[in-house]
Amino acid sequence: MPVSTTLLQSDLPGLPLRHRGKVRDVFDIPRDRLPADAPPGDYLLMVATDRLSAFDVVLPDPIPGKGEMLCQVSNFWFHKTEHLMPNHLVDIRVEQVLPEGVDPALYAKRAVVTRKLKPVPVEAIARGYLIGSGWKDYQRTGKISGIELPDGLRQAEKLPEPIFTPSTKAAVGDHDENIDFDAMVKTVGAELAERVRDATLRIYRFAADFAAECGILLADTKFEFGTDADGRLYVMDEMLTPDSSRYWPADQYELGTSPPSYDKQFVRDYLETLDWGKTAPGPSLPADVIDRTRAKYAEALQRLAGISVD
């Protein structure tokens, strides 16, 4: 899969920009841009750019091809798990909705047309191992998101059972905060909270088993969900990518450490060496950090989905 032109920001005349996130640009698709046989409803064009964020700050340097790799990993998992949970993808090709004069090749592997859904205002996180903010919470309280865990667990230890630990959904530049299930119920209601929790753990277990067959441990992952006008629940945005998940090479896993992962760890490690206040604007990245980060995303795509990047 050759990498096409690097894309830091997408601008598509005629498609109203709905949201520009840390990585994705989301556009409304006017009805007259849709194919005549498109089912009734509203649709979005979601573009995965090559932007990279760290510590909730979007950095000035892109990772070439990152958006394409993220999109392909997401699409792989959306199709792999559609027997478990409906997702936001629809059968409308990207080139059918792009404005005239826009090169379809630039967007073919980094964009998707999706249903327009009402987002559930909570991040849905599944954890199978004790790491990251969960490890910090456990050290301080013996719990994660109000869930009592056994005493004496070590960093990166596999949990007795996967757990659901929701968090707030912060705006770009702000930080998500872990909340307990009761707080989620107060936000979205008991029935929807239970559906999201059950779907999150169901997908996580399936994905963790599949990843293990590829020699990869899925330590934790974050999902976003949305509902349609009839209240049907969908998984949306991205799915089980190296940006939303913590993947560890199984042969490098070591209890009591923070194992290496298929993500932007090289970037975080480099930034920790700088005298930078972790606020915008972010610093530029050396070429070797960019190259090594790109290689990690490419390896994850190859090992999970069998898709090679030239």
Swiss-Prot record:
Keyword match ATP-binding: yes
Cellular component terms per the entry's GO annotation: cytoplasm
Catalytic activity: 5-amino-1-(5-phospho-D-ribosyl)imidazole-4-carboxylate + L-aspartate + ATP = (2S)-2-[5-amino-1-(5-phospho-beta-D-ribosyl)imidazole-4-carboxamido]succinate + ADP + phosphate + 2 H(+)
Segments passing through the bilayer: none
Domain of life: Bacteria
InterPro entries reported in the protein's UniProt record: SAICAR_synt/ADE2_N (IPR028923), SAICAR_synth (IPR001636), SAICAR_synthetase_CS (IPR018236)
GO molecular function: ATP binding; phosphoribosylaminoimidazolesuccinocarboxamide synthase activity
Annotated Gene3D superfamilies: ATP-grasp fold, B domain (3.30.470.20), Phosphorylase Kinase, domain 1 (3.30.200.20)
Keyword Nucleotide-binding carried by entry: yes
GO biological process: 'de novo' IMP biosynthetic process
Keywords: ATP-binding, Ligase, Nucleotide-binding, Purine biosynthesis
Biological or metabolic pathway of the protein: Purine metabolism; IMP biosynthesis via de novo pathway; 5-amino-1-(5-phospho-D-ribosyl)imidazole-4-carboxamide from 5-amino-1-(5-phospho-D-ribosyl)imidazole-4-carboxylate: step 1/2
Pfam families: SAICAR_synt
Entry EC number(s): 6.3.2.6
Listed PROSITE patterns: SAICAR_SYNTHETASE_1, SAICAR_SYNTHETASE_2
Entry similarity comment: Belongs to the SAICAR synthetase family.
Alphabetized HAMAP family for the sequence: SAICAR_synth
PANTHER family hit by this protein: PHOSPHORIBOSYLAMINOIMIDAZOLE-SUCCINOCARBOXAMIDE SYNTHASE
UniProt protein name: Phosphoribosylaminoimidazole-succinocarboxamide synthase
Organism of provenance: Xanthomonas oryzae pv. oryzae (strain KACC10331 / KXO85)
Lineage: Bacteria, Pseudomonadati, Pseudomonadota, Gammaproteobacteria, Lysobacterales
Gene that this sequence comes from: purC
